């Protein structure tokens, strides 16, 4: 496994552990479809939470959160729509898009980081 893939996997595990400690339940990790990918799919009470995990060793080149571009957001939304089509039992739950940014070892959980309309 390439070093960056290994680091990404470790960041996703750390993010998932953090979200579980906050009361969320994991449903899927690294959900792929033709149009995109979602790092984590969690459930918080009766809401589905689609999570993008971003990692930076330092903030020297910008924050981890700032690296979630509009293009990346659109790919996450496309993947979320695909997930909901594949999992019709969950399709009526409210959904949101969060980012977990890990920069220099600090975890920042940004709820409702973006919406479908952005």
From Swiss-Prot:
Annotated CDD domains: PoNe_Nuclease (cd20736)
One example GO MF annotation: nucleic acid binding
NCBIfam families xref list: PRK12497.1-3, YraN family protein
Family: Belongs to the UPF0102 family.
Protein name in the entry: UPF0102 protein Sde_3146
Originating species: Saccharophagus degradans (strain 2-40 / ATCC 43961 / DSM 17024)
